Design a protein with these regions (language model features):
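Short hydrophobic alpha-helices and adjacent helix-cap/hinge residues
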Residues: 1-262
Length: 262
């Protein structure tokens, strides 16, 4: 097995993908959407399996979810109801929300625009507003967090990408210090001290990617393997963090939780 890591630097991905192609690997597993793009640019023949793509059709990676075509297949973490459900859980947990929820996201990251639009649509359905907070690097993040001290939202929704994931401790610490309820896409943020997350189990999805690799190594063509979307989602709540922030999570929400960190 050959492992290549871009160290969070997207500019490194094309060279790393080219290197794997020169090694004539049998399959490339590209974890993020930018990595998939780099791998596709490097080869149209070596099979590529993507465990955590956002919207591979909208991103131009595959022709359709049912029949991807080409040399790419795998799994998507997108689901049409996710944006609405996350905001619905926020509203049910904090019914006094009146100001727009600040959505922290990176518009330069592949697939993120679709996830922000999903949040916008979900907000309309739930009956609350959202405010776009765009962060492209750590300097943007610090500036926007500081601005929230002056233009305070009622809650946060954090969209996960390499930037927000690498800065999750900073984001979690800010939300705790400001006593801002925050919803995250990934449970790793909650395990780091965040309040709550709702989304697919990433560990399970990555394990599913291994099944795709196995099928391809046994002769299946990637273009014939449908893209899987998550069917089950987990609500994770950090009750320890809630108590530290003097936040009371309604019992009705706690009963829905798949995991409670105490």
């Amino acid at each position: 097995m050959e492992i290549r890591w871009g160290e969070g630097k997207l500019a490194r991905l094309p060279a790393l993908a080219d290197e794997l192609v020169r090694l004539k690997v049998d399959v490339i597993v590209a974890v993020t959407s930018p990595a998939v793009l780099a791998a596709r640019q490097a080869t149209r023949t070596i099979p590529i399996v993507m465990p955590l793509s956002s919207d591979p059709v909208a991103d131009g990676l595959v022709a359709s979810l049912a029949r991807p075509g080409g040399n790419i297949t795998g799994l998507s973490v997108m689901s049409s109801e996710l944006g609405q459900k996350r905001l619905q859980l926020l509203k049910e947990s904090f019914p006094r929300l009146s100001r727009p929820v600040a959505v922290l996201w990176n518009p330069d990251y592949v697939g993120m625009a679709a996830r922000y639009r999903q949040a916008q649509g979900g907000a309309s359905s739930v009956g609350i507003g959202v405010r776009s907070v765009e962060v492209r690097d750590s300097r943007d993040l610090e500036r926007e967090l500081e601005s929230m001290d002056h233009e305070r939202p009622d809650a946060l929704l954090i969209l996960a990408d390499p930037l927000t994931t690498s800065q999750r401790l900073r984001i979690v610490e800010f939300a705790a210090a400001a006593r801002l309820p925050a919803m995250y896409e990934r449970s790793g943020f909650v395990e780091a001290g965040g309040l709550m997350s709702y989304g697919p189990n990433v560990d399970q999805i990555v394990r599913r990617a291994a099944i795709y690799v196995d099928k391809i190594l046994k002769g299946a063509r990637p273009g014939d393997l449908p893209i899987e979307q998550p069917e089950t989602f987990e609500l994770v709540i950090n009750l320890k963090s809630a108590k530290a922030q003097d936040i009371v999570i309604p019992q009705s929400i706690l009963l829905q939780a798949d995991k409670v960190i105490e």
